[in-house]
Structure formats: C-alpha cells, structure tokens
C-alpha cells in the first residue's frame, strides 16, 4: 500500500503532513492491512528530505519502527556548500539557482532554528535510523549532499546501499521508456522488496 500526502504550504506544514500520514499508517495498520514490520518511507528530491526527516522523527519522537528509507536524489542540506552545488548552476531540470530559491521560499528567509527534519543533514546523530537506499545522479546539483547523507548514515552504523548513477540528472526518471530509467526503477523496487522480505 502506498500512502502519500499533498504538500502546498511552507515549513513545517509538509513535514507535519508527512508525519501525520506515517502516524496514521502505524496507528491503523491492522485496518489498512499493513504489516508494521514492513513499513518504509521514501521520496525523491524534496520528498527525499521529507522521508529522511520522517525517519528521524520516527526514531526520536514517535515510537514508530521503520524497516527502510528510499531516498532518490534527495535534498538534505540547506547550507548548499558542496562541490556539486557550486558546479551545478545550469544542470538539467534542477540547478543550484533553483535550489537556493526553493530553500529561501520553503524556510521563509533562512535556516534559522529549524530542526534537522527540514534539512536532514543537520541532524546531531544518525544512529538508529532504518537501512537506506540512496540514489544520486551524476549531473545533479544535489549529488554530493546525497553522498554526504549516505556517508553520515554509514558512519553511524546504518546499512546503506548507494546508487551513484552515471549519465543522469535530477528527475531523469520522468522519461519512463528509457532503458536506464527502467533499470533504476527495477533497482529501487529490488531494494524495497529485499527490505520488506527482511521485515517479514
């Protein structure tokens, strides 16, 4: 079963909506036919930030056990200081200029005192989080912050599968008929299947 929230507002509204969806799934697992041992979060781009933030929230505040997090070219760091961000002013579909504008609008001016769920890389600790699949794209301004987040998870003892996909860009998977897209969708599906089988 896939549950998704519709996001249309500033921080923290999208995060609150995502957490509410996760809480609903956890609290109503029996009625929904959901196995709590096989509950995962996932998202791409800004949705990857929300998924990673939800995983942190589930660990710290909610008493919800997740079996997996699927993070596809995720936004993780509002500081935007990586090499790929500096190189990525004109990357296809998404670039550093748009990313800077997004953070300014989302955070309404700056990072301020927003907790790490707004920018998961700001977390004080990464231990105790669920295993992760982190996919990054070669020509994406977000490439390095995805790699950095995966490295932070691994350093904390979290099992992480990193897919650093060559020849791709942010949102490349909109081209559903392309062979490479099909290959990556299968890799993502395989990672989820493996996680769900372990949680069974």
Language-model-detected regions and their locations in the chain:
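Alpha/beta-hydrolase superfamily serine-hydrolase fold, recognizing
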Residues: 1-200
